[in-house]
């Protein structure tokens, strides 16, 4: 397995750790699945959520992931994949991730996630719904936490926000 997949909740530092990994592993291309999906469809993720719903987005996300792994297989390229926080909610995506990459769960506490999401809010459709940010994060993490752990080959604690150290740990474990 030449690919590295980074999974974890929104705000866990997948993009930041991915950038650090790309510096340490210059032969690997960093791909952000959300950005790849937007380029593939010509629409933003919030637009897809708003116009077609979460199920349509998850299907599109699965197609994008298949495309990336197929391209890697055909070209021999190796990728660092920064996956969306909900990518692992699809059984098909979980199987693809585990079969085609070494998967790292960037595990962060609720406090760290809330802090990071308040600092870098972005447009995150899954956090909408009238509840407080903390209660929505807690609700989603209750459902997703066990899935992240089950999907990952390795778990990296990122509560210290030292993304370079997390990237070094990943290179060591890879």
Spans of features found by a protein language model:
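Pre-Walker A (Motif I) flank of P-loop NTPase domains
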Residues: 1-4, 76-77
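NTP-dependent small-molecule kinase module
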Residues: 4, 16, 20, 115, ...
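P-loop (Walker A) phosphate-binding loop of NTP-binding proteins
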Residues: 9
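Conserved glycine(s) of the Walker
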Residues: 13
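Post-Walker A helix-loop "phosphate-sensing" segment adjacent to the P-loop in P-loop NTPases
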Residues: 23-31
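ATP-dependent small-molecule kinase phosphotransfer cores
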Residues: 35-87, 91-98, 125, 138
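Short glycine-rich anion-binding loops that position phosphate/pyrophosphate groups of nucleotides
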Residues: 84-88, 109-111, 161
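A glycine- and Lys/Arg-enriched "phosphate-lid" helix/loop adjacent to the NTP-binding pocket
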Residues: 99-145
């Amino acid at each position: 397995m030449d690919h590295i997949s980074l999974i974890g909740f929104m705000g866990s530092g997948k993009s930041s750790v991915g950038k650090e990994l790309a510096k340490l592993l210059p032969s690997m291309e960093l791909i952000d699945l959300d950005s790849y999906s937007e380029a593939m469809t010509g629409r933003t993720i919030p637009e897809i959520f708003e116009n077609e719903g979460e199920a349509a987005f998850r299907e599109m996300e699965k197609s994008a992931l298949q495309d990336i792994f197929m391209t890697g297989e055909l070209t021999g390229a190796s990728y660092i994949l920064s996956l969306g926080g909900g990518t692992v909610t699809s059984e098909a995506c979980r199987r693809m991730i585990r079969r085609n990459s070494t998967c790292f769960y960037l595990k962060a506490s609720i406090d760290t996630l809330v802090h990071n999401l308040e600092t870098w809010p972005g447009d995150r459709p899954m956090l909408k719904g009238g509840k407080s940010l903390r209660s929505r994060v807690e609700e989603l993490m209750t459902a997703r936490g066990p899935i992240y752990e089950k999907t990952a080959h390795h778990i990296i604690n990122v509560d210290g926000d030292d993304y370079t150290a997390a990237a070094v740990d990943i290179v060591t474990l890879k």
